[in-house]
């Protein structure tokens, strides 16, 4: 092995003091293999255990924090207390070989699939029509009410509590890839005229809610990460200038890492 790669195998300490055995991370893999109700299936466990063997952190597939947020079939759920037992099995499998196990907490927003959403009621920061996972025709999303936005924020906090109860070492907040948090940051998706027109207000509120749950139910060792997409093709969309401002805001919060997803 070339010497320039050797640092990848060195231990690294996160801002919260947790030590990782190396610098390799298994990014979340969309496997569409959870049970229809979002509970963890027997197929998932050996799949994720095998892939978690030699990394420092392993992150489970995007897990919906609310039934009004499911973006693809076979998506794991962290929306209900009844999900916790299956999530315990998942966390155990992910940690079996020494990796820190995180669950990615997620809300699809406009990318929700109507057939997987209660009453087919897809919500987004502003009204929009688009194609999502596997769709040949567009579906429409309506604008979220203030109450629905506040509930979505609380849902991320409750998902964090469930992750803690299930034995995960942390959560990754999914703020990338055109899903709900990304949509609030993007001027393409967020055309509101109220307080939520501030594109940084929603992601910051979600992080604050997650950190509040961490403080209430866990300790400083619980890892909190944030995933973002720095640019998008849509116009007007997220630019590097917008992302720089977002990073300036969230990097001053007690999170442990930022995960960049180039989509």
Regions found by a protein language model. Give the residues of each.
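Flavin-dependent oxidoreductase catalytic cores
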Residues: 1-263
